[in-house]
C-alpha cells in the first residue's frame, strides 16, 4: 500500500475545522473515520446526526499516543502493556472513563474506548490537534450507520459527501486503508480481558501479550461499535453460504431470472451460472480483510437482485472477516 505524502496545509485546515466544531473524514489504517472534537458535545452529536447513528451507541476516542490514556481513562497494567506493543495500531482498549470524558462520547456508559491509529495522516492530525491538553477525536467509520465502511476517500464522498450538498466539512484523502476492517476491540474494564470486536490483532496475539486466555465478551459487556447483529451491510440483499450451497443457490436464483453478484474463490467461477459481477475472493485472511469493504461496495454497485458470498474458512485467523461478513449478510 502506498500512502500519499502528508499535506501539511490540509492537516492545518482540518485542525482549524475541528477547533470550531466541524466534521472531518480522516484516513486510518483500518477504515476512514468521521472525526470530531471529543470534548465538544455539539460536534460529537453532529457526528451522530451525519451518520444517522443512535446516540446510545458509544464512540472511540482517537489519541496521539499512549501518554494520553490517563487523561481519558483509568489505565491498567494490561492497557499499558498492550499500548506499548500495539500502539500506534489497530487495537482499541475499553477502560473505565475519567470525568473529563463526556457521556456524549460513551453512550451514557462509565467506560470509554481509546485507540491510537498508525496511519501517517491520522497520526499527524492527532498530534497537531491534541497538543498539551491531550485532546482526542471521536471517529466512527465515515459512512451512514449500518452500511458498508469506507476504505478510501471515494467511499466517503459517495456516501456522506462534503457540504453544501453533503454532510462533512472536509475529507482528508490519505489513500486506501492498509487493513480495511475495523480495529480489534478489547474490554479491560471488568477485571478480565475480553474481545468485544475481532480485528487484525488476533486472539492469539492478545493471549501471548497478556499471558492469559482472552475469551469473547459476554452479554454483560459494555456496548461497543460494530456489535449489532446487522452492520456493514450493502443495500442489496446479501447471503453468506458454504461453497456448495452457494453454487446451488446461484443456479436456483438464476433460474428465477434474478441478476446476481457473487464473491467466491476463483475455482468456483466455472461452476456458476452467468452472473452480473464475479469477484475473486483472496485466499489469505489479511488480504481478504483489506479488500472486503471495497469488494462489498463493488458488489452493491452492480445493482444485482442478490449478492451471494462464499463463507470463509472457520479458523482463528479468519475470525474478523467472518464476523464482518456475518453482520453484513444478517
Q: Where are the regions that the model predicts?
A:
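Active-site-adjacent structural elements in enzyme catalytic cores
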Residues: 1-330
Amino acid at each position: 500500500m502506498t500512502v500519499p505524502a502528508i499535506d501539511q496545509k490540509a492537516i492545518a485546515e482540518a485542525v482549524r475545522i475541528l477547533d470550531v466544531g466541524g466534521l472531518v473524514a480522516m484516513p486510518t489504517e483500518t477504515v476512514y473515520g468521521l472525526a470530531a472534537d471529543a470534548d465538544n458535545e455539539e460536534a460529537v452529536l453532529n457526528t451522530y446526526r451525519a451518520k444517522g447513528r443512535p446516540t446510545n451507541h458509544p464512540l472511540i476516542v482517537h489519541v496521539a499516543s499512549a501518554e494520553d490514556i490517563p487523561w481519558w481513562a483509568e489505565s491498567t497494567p494490561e492497557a499499558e502493556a498492550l499500548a506499548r506493543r500495539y500502539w500506534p495500531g489497530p487495537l482499541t482498549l475499553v477502560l473505565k472513563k475519567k470525568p473529563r470524558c463526556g457521556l456524549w462520547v460513551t453512550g451514557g456508559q462509565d467506560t470509554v474506548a481509546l485507540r491510537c491509529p498508525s496511519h501517517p495522516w491520522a497520526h499527524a492530525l492527532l498530534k497537531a490537534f491534541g497538543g498539551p491538553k491531550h485532546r482526542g477525536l471521536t471517529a466512527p467509520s465515515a459512512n451512514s450507520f449500518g452500511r458498508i465502511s469506507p476504505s478510501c476517500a471515494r467511499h466517503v464522498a459517495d456516501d456522506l459527501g462534503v457540504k453544501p450538498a453533503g454532510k462533512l466539512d472536509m475529507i482528508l484523502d490519505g489513500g486506501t486503508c492498509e487493513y480495511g476492517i475495523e480495529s480489534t476491540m478489547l474490554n479491560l474494564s471488568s477485571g478480565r480481558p475480553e474481545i468485544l470486536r475481532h480485528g487484525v490483532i488476533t486472539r492469539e496475539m492478545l493471549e501471548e501479550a497478556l499471558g492469559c486466555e482472552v475469551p469473547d465478551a459476554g452479554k454483560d459487556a459494555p456496548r461497543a461499535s460494530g456489535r449489532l447483529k446487522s452492520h456493514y451491510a450493502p443495500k442489496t440483499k446479501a447471503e453468506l453460504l458454504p461453497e456448495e450451497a452457494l453454487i446451488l443457490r446461484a443456479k436456483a436464483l438464476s433460474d428465477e431470472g434474478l441478476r446476481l453478484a457473487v464473491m467466491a474463490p476463483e475455482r468456483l467461477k466455472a461452476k456458476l451460472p452467468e452472473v452480473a459481477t464475479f469477484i475473486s475472493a483472496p485466499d489469505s485472511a489479511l488480504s481478504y480483510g483489506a479488500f472486503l469493504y471495497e469488494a462489498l461496495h463493488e458488489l452493491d454497485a452492480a445493482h444485482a437482485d442478490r449478492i451471494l458470498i462464499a463463507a470463509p474458512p472457520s479458523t482463528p485467523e479468519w475470525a474478523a472477516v467472518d464476523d464482518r461478513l456475518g453482520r453484513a449478510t444478517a
